[in-house]
Design a protein with these regions (language model features):
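Short amphipathic alpha-helices in soluble, non-transmembrane regions
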Residues: 20-26, 82-90
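N-terminal pre-domain and mature-chain start segments
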Residues: 25, 29-33
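Conserved long hydrophobic alpha-helices within structured protein cores
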Residues: 33-42, 73-75, 81-82
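Glycine-rich beta-strand-turn "strand-cap" elements at beta-sheet edges
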Residues: 31, 37-62, 88-117
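Long, hydrophobic N-terminal alpha-helical segment
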Residues: 1-21, 25
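Short, well-ordered beta-strand segments in beta-rich or mixed alpha/beta enzyme
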Residues: 4-11, 49-86
Length: 117
């Protein structure tokens, strides 16, 4: 069963190109270790909420943009094995491919796909 890792982050708007380059480099590593696809989306219409919202969830500050991303894997097992390899891959190290955003406010989780229409 297809498995999805989902991510939401706040990225300094001025770092859009740095983020795109970071994500492209990361995508190569993830795909080499079993990911089927990696998608990165730059916030365009992401409203503030009163109780909950993407900006609130990642404590988005002025001058930051919400990014929504996901990685598709063939299965949970493939994801677990692949993620271990990604984390051990030297190309994933912060000194090689630094994150151009505050990783402490990154939200992520793994999800079983139940509808793919």
């Amino acid at each position: 069963m297809t498995y999805v890792d989902g991510f939401v982050a706040a990225v300094p708007t001025a770092n859009r190109e740095k983020y795109r380059i970071h994500a492209e480099k990361a995508a190569v590593v993830f795909k080499e270790h079993g990911a089927l696809k990696l998608v990165e989306c730059w916030g365009d219409d992401v409203p503030d909420g009163e109780l909950t919202s993407f900006p609130m969830a990642v404590q988005c500050k002025p001058g930051e943009t919400v990014v929504f991303s996901w990685i598709l894997w063939p299965s949970r097992q493939a994801r677990d094995e692949g993620m271990k390899k990604v984390m051990a891959d030297p190309r994933s190290k912060p000194d090689v491919n630094p994150m151009p955003f505050d990783g402490k406010r990154l939200i992520y989780g793994g999800f079983e796909m139940i509808v793919d229409a």
